[in-house]
Amino acid sequence: MSRVLSEVLAAVRPVDQSLFPVAKAHLDNLTKPRGSLGRLEELAARLFVIGGGAKPVVDPARIYVCAGDHGVAAEGVSLFPQEVTRQMVANFLAGGAGINVLAATAGIDLRVVDAGCLGDPFAPHPRFAGARVASGTANLAEAPAMTREQCESALLLGVSLAEAAAAEGVRALGTGDMGIANTTPSTALFCAYLGLSPAEITGPGTGLDAGGVGRKAAIVAKGLALHADVVAGGDPVAVLACLGGLEIACLAGLVIGAAACRLPIAVDGFISTAAYVAARAICPTVADYAVVSHASAEPGYAPIMAALGQKPLLDLGLRLGEGTGAALALFLMRSACNIYNDMATFASAGVSEG
C-alpha cells in the first residue's frame, strides 16, 4: 500500500460513542413522545455524534457521480451498449438525468467525475472533474480489472474529492455512479468481501431476462475463480483491483475520504454499496460515517444488507443508481438535523411532559 494511502487510512478515527447518550437525552427532551420520530431520531443522533457533539449540520451537501467503463461489458452482461456511459455523462452535465432533478429538488450540489471512461476527454465544464485514471478496465473474467497502481490511484482520487469538498465547506457527501456493466464487478466484490455466491445475488441490472442473469452469474463466478488466490489472500485493495472498477474504487476512496474528514456520507444503491463494502474492508471505521440510503431493487441486495447487519433508510424500489437514493437520503439527513436543532424542548415551549 502506498505511503499516501496509508496516511489517509491512519487519519480515519472512530466516532466518540459516549456522545450517543447525550444525543438521546436531548431528543427525549423535545416536544414529542420519546422515540416517536423513529429512525429520524436515530439518524439525528448519528449525525450529532459524527460531528463530535456540535449541532448536526449537513448543508451544504454534495453528491459526486463517478463514471467509468468496464472491460467485462464485452461479455454481454448489460442490455445497454458501452457508449451509454459517455452519453449519460453528457446528460448529467446538461442537467437532464434523474439525479439532476432530485439533487436540484433537494438543494444538493452535483459534481460529475470521469474516473475511467473510454474515448476522448470530455469538454471542460464547471461541475466536471476530468480525472481519468485509465480508459476503462480490463475484463475481470480474463485478467485483473485494474493494476494495483491504477486501483490505488482511483482510491486516492476519491479521497481528494472528499478533501476538496471539505475544504470548500461542504458538510455532507453522497455517492453516485455511472458505468455500463458495473453491476457485474459490484456483484463480484460482494461475493469476494462478504462470502456470498453469484447465484444468490446476481440480478438483472438494467433489465436482463432470466437467461441473461444466469450468464452474468457465470461470468461473475468465472472472475472469482480466476482471482481466487487473491480473494483468499485477504488483501482488500488487491481484491478491488482484480474485481472492481475505476469508478467503484473512486467511490470507495470518497467514502474513506469522507470519514477522514469527519463528514457523513450517504451511500447510494447497488454499485455505491459495493464501493462502501470495499472501503469498509480496507478501513472498517468508515462504517461510523456512512448512511446506507436505500434498499436497491436488485434481488441480491437483501442478503448483502443481512451480511452487513445494516438497514437502509428507504425502500422505494429504486434501481437507477446515479446517486438518486443518496439525494433522497441527504434530504432526510437534513430533516433529522433540523429536528435536533430546531424543535422546542418541553421547558422552552411550556409543554408538560408525559
From Swiss-Prot:
Reaction(s) catalysed (UniProt annotation): 5,6-dimethylbenzimidazole + nicotinate beta-D-ribonucleotide = alpha-ribazole 5'-phosphate + nicotinate + H(+)
UniProt pathway: Nucleoside biosynthesis; alpha-ribazole biosynthesis; alpha-ribazole from 5,6-dimethylbenzimidazole: step 1/2
GO biological process: cobalamin biosynthetic process
Keyword terms of this UniProt record: Cobalamin biosynthesis, Glycosyltransferase, Transferase
The protein's Enzyme Commission number: 2.4.2.21
Class in the EC hierarchy, top level: transferase
Keyword Magnesium: no
Keyword Transferase set for record: yes
Pfam families noted in UniProt: DBI_PRT (PF02277)
GO MF: nicotinate-nucleotide-dimethylbenzimidazole phosphoribosyltransferase activity
Residue numbers annotated as active site: E322
Functional note: Catalyzes the synthesis of alpha-ribazole-5'-phosphate from nicotinate mononucleotide (NAMN) and 5,6-dimethylbenzimidazole (DMB).
Record family assignment: Belongs to the CobT family.
HAMAP family (alphabetical): CobT (MF_00230)
Protein name: Nicotinate-nucleotide--dimethylbenzimidazole phosphoribosyltransferase
Source organism: Solidesulfovibrio magneticus (strain ATCC 700980 / DSM 13731 / RS-1)
Gene name in the database record: cobT
